Design a protein with these regions (language model features):
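Active-site microenvironment for binding and transforming phosphate-containing groups
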Residues: 1-138
Length: 138
């Protein structure tokens, strides 16, 4: 089920798939903030009380301190990484393939969160499933 706004699939099918996902998690069609992922080390920061872009930015991670803003990254073989600082109410979602990881996207996101006031000892990470080296040749 492809939900990627930056994919080569027909847009009408991507929109249909997104509607299914959003309905299942109880969110409006426009609620979840998605990215146009390109295997980079770039991210976007959606700051509290600031306007949210209408178009998906071309980046591979999102950081926000906006409450009630669902964020997501889409992965197949890449690693989804979620970060959270409960004290400052910051969250991040990272799309980390081998290219993004090599370019330092994970440390870049954490350094930015620390720059914004997060204590690195308060940041909790959740790492999602990905393909294994045994099953994938780079």
């Amino acid at each position: 089920m492809n939900c990627g706004p930056g994919s080569n699939d027909k847009k009408k099918f991507v929109k249909k798939n997104l509607k299914i996902v959003r309905r299942k998690i109880g969110k409006n069609t426009k609620d979840i903030f998605l990215l146009h992922q390109v295997h980079s080390n770039k991210f976007i920061f959606l700051e509290k009380n600031k306007k949210i872009p209408k178009k998906s930015p071309i980046v591979d991670a999102i950081i926000t301190n906006q409450e009630k803003l669902p964020i997501a990254v889409l992965t197949a073989d890449c690693v989804p990484i979620l970060l959270c600082d409960n004290k400052l109410k910051f969250i991040a979602a990272i799309h980390s393939g081998w290219k993004s990881a090599y370019k330092g996207i994970i440390s870049k996101v954490i350094k930015f969160m620390v720059k914004k006031g997060c204590n690195k000892n308060n940041i909790i990470a959740a790492i999602g499933p990905c393909i294994s080296q045994k099953n994938y040749e780079v």
